[in-house]
A protein has these predicted regions:
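Glycine-centric low-complexity/flexibility signal
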Residues: 571-576, 595-724, 734-740
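Short, conserved beta-turn/loop elements at beta-strand boundaries and strand-helix junctions
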Residues: 174-183, 249-255, 259-263, 509-516
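C-terminal extracytoplasmic interaction modules
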Residues: 1, 56, 68-75, 83, ...
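Polar/acidic, low-complexity leader/linker segments enriched in S/T/G and N/D
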Residues: 1-94
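The right-handed parallel beta-helix/beta-solenoid scaffold, focusing on the short coil/turn
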Residues: 149, 217, 235, 243, ...
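Short, T/G/N/S-enriched strand-turn elements that build extracellular solenoid repeat scaffolds
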Residues: 546-560, 576-586, 627, 727-732
Length: 740
């Protein structure tokens, strides 16, 4: 039976009221600072300057009899007060905006509670907490708001340790009580970028201490001390939303080194007018800009959620362009993110399982990406929906913003424009579909970036992408992930001859149900356009097996020549199965960066008249290549031996387990119990564990399958075959032998 546990983290003070402990001293005095002791929350704190919070985790589940829970083997308290849990999956919008947030809505039954776990001073209270109030009403009263608190949804099977359950990470967006119910709505962390929560730049608190004329060369800020508190040593400020000035600063005095800067005019200003700091990005990679906007201007964003190295690799080496902007007034972070997603060509989403913000460039799906067809798609669930509103035949981009204080969508506020037209698209559809973009991010001298933007949008949306909706069986090997590219095949997808074709697509919404995965995807056909060439970088950002690097290269680039530099990058979360470097001309400089995993295939378990299969090799090469392993390289695990008590080897009471790898090995059949299939990280268990006829376990990555009395497991696979050809930039985590 599937079990769902909800966890909330409440900021809970480590100190004890009026006491000195190893955690520190609370200076509160009962009867002076408060009439009763606190509840160790900020709202009830009598000495806020000393508030020292750590997360207190509260856990909840649906009523389920005598079910007990553990975390890392230790019993934990889980309150059985959940009435319902509903999940609305996220929707990503490739190359357009950040899409819609994933939402978890939990309805709780409010109930009396003893205040155990949430009150350090139960013995000092002059009332019985169980007889006074209810749990959630008291929780709400003791905290200023639950909004922004960490929220986790754990899903597993009954009896699973909480640490082994799949955990989805969110933040609370709202909480409310009505009658005997209490409702919490949590969303993915991009809700923190909402316009009501995050602005960049932040509003400045400095104002003019005295008026200035249009020719004055300095100004003084008020209140005293605000200069050191909020303003850097140099930069730009916008005065009263009318004039931008460059400055250097000493204390509260700004020396105005350029009046009427950034396309504005010098003007006189009155005492008390706001002096707003301008946020400036000059020739920065989009990955750097987005990281800064999120980490420094979006309260609650944890820098650990951002893999800056992977982001930089993605945009610097695939997009290869820099961007600039002056943001002269507080602007919604979500607005800035949406502009960059569209104008750079990005896909951006929250990975709720890995707790990572994912950033990818808008690019074609590999011809070797996972194929979903009739064997994986549940019958009658496939639908293809036309989306004519997404078609583009012309892109007009205005760039080189004149004045950051003027309207963003005013044509006269831009120095340059470029229009890119696909005349065949206009002819095919007998009408134009014009897309206008007003970019603060593309400087007037950066025409190549504007040209690339136009070509990229035409490439992606020249033909309106269809929406594909379908359900996949829960038992499939290639589990889909949000944002991943794949290929889909259905009788309704045909070419002009009526032949069924496999169309490329990208997962835009993923809902996990008990027996299926419900997928929404967007067709990802790219029509070749000019201005899209970059350095030769090949990304592997979806799971693939049988990866030949030369084949992948030749699918997107022309024939390689000697002395070319070519990089392959396995993205975080992606698996490259059975990597073969392939044949290349002499002196090509090859590098593969593994941020995800490179795995050999798992061996199948021993069966009747069938030997167990050895694990496969993860990386094979006979050509020089450099490897920067930031993830995992692992040979496949060997299949386990079957289990039987008969020297005649019949019957086979228990099947052996499949080896770890990609794809994982299959378990074998047994009369009493089958062996389990392997996974990408662990070998499957043999059947009938703990009996005399138990099947052998499949091997972990690079490990042999387990032998039994009469059954024989197979050898583990090699991590690398061709080690002498490799220049190891970083060895990283390796499972299995390195040979030759």
């Amino acid at each position: 039976m599937t079990v769902t546990v909800i966890e909330l983290d409440i900021p809970f003070c480590d100190l004890r009221y009026g006491e000195t402990t190893t955690e520190g001293t609370c200076p509160a005095v009962l009867g002076v600072d408060s009439e009763r002791k606190c509840f160790n929350t900020i709202r009830t704190c009598a000495a806020r300057a000393s508030f020292t919070p750590s997360p207190l985790t509260l856990r909840f589940c649906m009523p389920a009899g005598d079910v007990e829970f553990t975390r890392n083997g230790q019993p934990v308290v889980v309150i059985p007060s959940i009435k319902s849990v509903n999940v609305t999956p996220a929707i990503i919008n490739p190359g357009v905006d950040i899409g819609n947030r994933e939402t978890v809505r939990v309805v709780f039954e409010d109930h009396p509670h003893s205040d155990a776990m949430v009150d350090k001073y139960l013995a000092d209270r002059d009332y019985d907490p169980y007889q006074r109030g209810t749990f959630f009403a008291k929780l709400r009263a003791r905290n200023p708001s639950l909004e922004g608190y960490a929220f986790r949804m754990l899903v597993g099977d009954e009896g699973d340790d909480l640490a082994d359950m799949t955990t989805y990470h969110y933040v609370i967006d709202s909480a409310s009580g009505q009658g005997e119910q209490f409702t919490i709505a949590a969303k993915d962390v991009l809700i923190l970028a909402d316009k009501k929560k995050a602005q960049a730049p932040r509003i400045s608190n400095g104002v003019l201490a005295a008026g200035i004329s249009e020719v004055d060369g300095s100004l003084t800020l008020s209140p005293a001390g605000i200069g050191n508190a909020e303003y850097p040593a140099s930069g730009k400020v916008a005065i009263a939303g009318k004039e931008i000035c460059s400055f250097t600063r000493s204390g509260d005095v700004l020396t105005l080194t350029q009046r009427g800067d950034s396309g504005t005019e010098a003007d006189e200003h009155d005492e008390g007018e706001i002096v707003q700091l301008v946020l400036i990005y000059e020739s920065e990679a989009p990955s750097t800009i987005i990281n800064d906007i999120l980490v420094n201007y979006t309260p609650g964003v944890d820098p650990a959620w951002i893999n800056t190295a992977e982001w930089a690799t993605e945009v610097d080496e695939y997009i290869g362009r820099l961007y600039s902007a002056e943001i002269a007034e507080p602007t919604s972070v979500i607005e800035l993110l949406n502009e960059l997603i569209e104008q750079v060509g990005l896909v951006f989403w929250w990975d709720s399982i890995t707790k990572q913000l994912r950033l990818r460039s808008l690019r074609p799906v590999s011809a070797e990406a996972t194929l979903y067809g009739d064997d994986q798609i549940m019958a009658t669930t496939f639908r293809a929906t036309e989306q004519p509103g997404k078609r583009i035949s012309e892109v007009w981009t205005y760039y080189g913003q004149r004045n950051p204080l003027e309207g963003l969508d005013e044509v006269k506020n831009y120095r340059a424009a470029i229009a890119t037209v696909d005349p065949e698209a206009d002819q095919d559809y007998e009408q134009s579909a014009i897309k206008k973009i007003f970019s603060r991010w593309i400087a007037s001298n950066n025409r190549p970036a504007a040209s690339r933007l136009n070509s990229m949008l035409l490439s992606r949306y020249r033909d309106a992408p269809r929406k594909f909706s379908f359900s996949l069986y829960e038992t499939i090997d290639a589990v889909p992930t949000l944002g991943a590219g794949f290929r889909v095949e259905s009788w309704s997808l045909q070419d002009d001859t009526g032949a069924v074709v496999a169309e490329p697509a990208q997962v835009t919404s993923l809902e996990r149900k008990e027996d299926r995965y419900v997928i929404d995807a967007q067709e990802a056909i790219f029509v070749t356009q000019e201005d899209l060439e970059t350095s030769k970088v090949v990304f592997i950002d979806e799971n693939m097996s049988g990866v030949n690097l030369r084949t992948l290269h030749d699918q997107i680039y022309s024939t390689p020549e000697s002395y070319e530099v070519i990089r392959f990058i396995v993205s975080s979360g992606a698996i490259a199965g059975t990597v073969v470097v392939g044949d290349w001309p002499d002196f090509v400089d090859l590098t593969i960066v593994i941020n995800g995993q490179a795995l050999g295939r798992g061996g199948n378990a021993q069966g009747l008249l069938v030997n167990a299969q050895a694990g496969g090799t993860a990386i094979y090469t006979r050509y020089p290549i450099s490897i920067d392993n930031q993830g995992t390289i692992g040979g496949g695990g060997g299949g386990g031996g079957f289990g039987t008590t008969s020297s005649e080897l019949f019957p086979i009471e228990a099947g052996g387990g499949g080896g770890a790898g990609y794809p994982p090995g299959s378990g074998s059949s047994g009369v009493i119990e089958n062996g389990q299939n392997g996974t990408t990280t662990a070998g499957g268990l043999g059947g009938a564990q703990g009996t005399a006829y138990a099947g052998g376990n499949g091997g972990g990555l690079g490990q042999a399958g387990q032998n039994t009395t009469y059954g024989t497991g197979a050898a583990g696979g090699r991590a690398v075959d061709g080690d002498s050809y490799i220049n190891w930039i970083n060895l990283g985590t390796v499972h299995g032998a390195r040979v030759n």
